[in-house]
Amino acid sequence: MSERIKPTISGSAETMLQSFYARAQYSKSKHNKFYDAKAVELVDKIDYDFSTAARDSTMGKGVIARTVVFDELVKNFIEKNPDCTVVNIACGLDTRFYRMDNGKITWYNLDLPETIAIRNQIFEESGRVSTIGISALDPAWSKEVKVRGKMLFIIEGLSTVS
């Protein structure tokens, strides 16, 4: 991915890019509670004006607080269930798989088709991490998930939609 990626965005896609930016910027801070290497790696490859996200410190602090809490919960679950299957519902541009991967988990990133299209422009995901482009309200997505071990469902992305 040497060229800059220019995603076509509108509406809630703005929020996912701003959240992605907030995690990347926080990861560069001196006293961070998590380091999001994937966000740091990819944020500069995205051709997008992040100035709104840079100015919105309240939104950024909310993203960071949620990330710290959810990371801890997911980490604890994976430590107890190392061969688990995780479904990240309304994933947006979440990079938690890359922070939590133990080499065994199976991870599904689920979101609306237009969101997954943007995600697929930015991430090259395959193997134990894959994407499902379908509404969380459509029960058909469950047919795409191959369960291995215990299941964890993350709904952090749904908690940010107003």
Predicted regions and their residues:
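Rossmann-like AdoMet
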Residues: 1-87, 91-134, 146-148
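A short, conserved alpha-helix within the catalytic core of class I
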Residues: 131, 140-142, 160-162
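Adenine-nucleotide cofactor-binding loop residues
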Residues: 137
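Soluble catalytic domains of membrane acyltransferases
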Residues: 142-146, 152
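A short SAM/SAH-binding and catalytic strip from SAM-dependent methyltransferases
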Residues: 150-162
